[in-house]
Amino acid sequence: MKDNERRILLGRVVGGFGLRGEIKMESWTEPRDAIFRYQPWLLRSPTGTESMLNGARGYDTGKRLIATFPGINDRNAVEAICGTEIYVPRSALPPPHPDEYYWVDLEGLQVHTLEGVVLGSVSHLFSNGANDVVVIHGERERLIPFVQPDYVKSVDFEAERIVVDWDPEF
């Protein structure tokens, strides 16, 4: 597996909510309010300034994630941190369940067909609502449903490879 101490982007401050320093956040954890379990956070401002934060609290309204940060008590303070990204070390995340993967761990792996044709490497993944989709950059970009065992036959972190049942012409 890759370096456990690399930083993983979990979310971002997107704006203020009300006048008392509440913060609208974007979270890429699942469920999205799980981001509060992985503290302390490394905050990185849009200008590149970094700081540590512990003690953030929040809740999911169903439409958005709302948070409070220690020391942020009014809307002006929130506006000053808009765009700030929230990171944690990879080691802060619990081990995934068998046959489940963190997307970040799949990024960079080479993708091979059953016949041994190299399609490229994993750029990123996204969810289309029905399933996750792996985006592969190679001779051209390919999008393959990350569905086991239909399309994804194996993931081998030691060999840094994913094997898929996919027509290389498609």
UniProtKB/Swiss-Prot annotation:
Signal peptide extent: none
Molecular function in Gene Ontology: ribosome binding
GO cellular component, one term: ribosome
Residues annotated as transmembrane: none
Cellular location(s): Cytoplasm
Pfam families recorded: PRC_RimM, RimM
Keyword line: Chaperone, Cytoplasm, Ribosome biogenesis, rRNA processing
Listed InterPro entries: PRC_barrel-like_sf, PRC_RimM, RimM, RimM_N, RimM_N_sf, Transl_B-barrel_sf
Gene Ontology terms: biological process: ribosomal small subunit biogenesis; rRNA processing
Main location: cytoplasm
PANTHER family per record: RIBOSOME MATURATION FACTOR RIMM
HAMAP family in UniProt: Ribosome_mat_RimM (MF_00014)
Family listed: Belongs to the RimM family.
Function (record text): An accessory protein needed during the final step in the assembly of 30S ribosomal subunit, possibly for assembly of the head region. Essential for efficient processing of 16S rRNA. May be needed both before and after RbfA during the maturation of 16S rRNA. It has affinity for free ribosomal 30S subunits but not for 70S ribosomes.
UniProt name for this protein: Ribosome maturation factor RimM
Organism whose genome encodes this protein: Xylella fastidiosa (strain M12)
